[in-house]
Amino acid sequence: MYVVSTKQMLNNAQRGGYAVPAFNIHNLETMQVVVETAANLHAPVIIAGTPGTFTHAGTENLLALVSAMAKQYHHPLAIHLDHHTKFDDIAQKVRSGVRSVMIDASHLPFAQNISRVKEVVDFCHRFDVSVEAELGQLGGQEDDVQVNEADAFYTNPAQAREFAEATGIDSLAVAIGTAHGMYASAPALDFSRLENIRQWVNLPLVLHGASGLSTKDIQQTIKLGICKINVATELKNAFSQALKNYLTEHPEATDPRDYLQSAKSAMRDVVSKVIADCGCEGRA
């Protein structure tokens, strides 16, 4: 009842002029932080996991957790495959109950990207599963995939329209200057490119690599058509640093129920800020 597709979430965001944050989780504690915070703020959120996360935690386990927590908090949640590349892997998870997919073939030439994505779209739409794909490629590291900055490239607005029409995707991830990971200095986002893409494509647009972006930049991208904001590294960093600090200050600590609380609190602050930046509080 409460586990939903991202399609309606993002269409609502597009109409409402806000964005839905997609938070990458890794285990029970990180999922608790996202769901509890979202429920308290009545904010729509997407629970995202890379292939590595699904391998680590188990697809069935993650689906069961999302379903149980959605019912517990009476809060709609979507579980989303982030940066998945293999058709068979996606198909297996869709058959298990996942209803939102990102097929990432952005590393392929344009025509091959279209072909790979369309194969996934044709399969997923049979199950009423929403599909996101990426045109252009971000630098940085996501899971085990490292893209050098020299190999990253921005989304071509005219190609974006052709790509969307040829594949039948439900949302489009764009490359406008963000990167996976944290930034050594503030990135210069190509807002004019984003505005141009918006003129060519009427789908909800997605921004990856949002960890560490300023509130001003996030809100400007939303004004120009971004409907989904992906955050991963910033959550991991906050959680990990708080845990390290606690264990340094309390070397005698051995109970995870105690020492994980500070990590959850630090991550909760990040989740709350991103929800505020996205303007989605009270929109669930």
UniProtKB/Swiss-Prot annotation:
Record CDD domains: TBP_aldolase_IIB
Pfam families for the chain: F_bP_aldolase (PF01116)
SUPFAM superfamilies: Aldolase
Keywords: Galactitol metabolism, Lyase, Metal-binding, Zinc
Any one annotated GO CC term: cytosol
Top EC group: lyase
Cofactor: Zn(2+)
Keyword Cell cycle attached: no
Documented EC number(s): 4.1.2.40
GO terms of biological process kind: D-tagatose 6-phosphate catabolic process; galactitol catabolic process
The UniProt record lists the keyword Metal-binding: yes
Function: Catalytic subunit of the tagatose-1,6-bisphosphate aldolase GatYZ, which catalyzes the reversible aldol condensation of dihydroxyacetone phosphate (DHAP or glycerone-phosphate) with glyceraldehyde 3-phosphate (G3P) to produce tagatose 1,6-bisphosphate (TBP). Requires GatZ subunit for full activity and stability. Is involved in the catabolism of galactitol.
Protein name: D-tagatose-1,6-bisphosphate aldolase subunit GatY
Gene: gatY
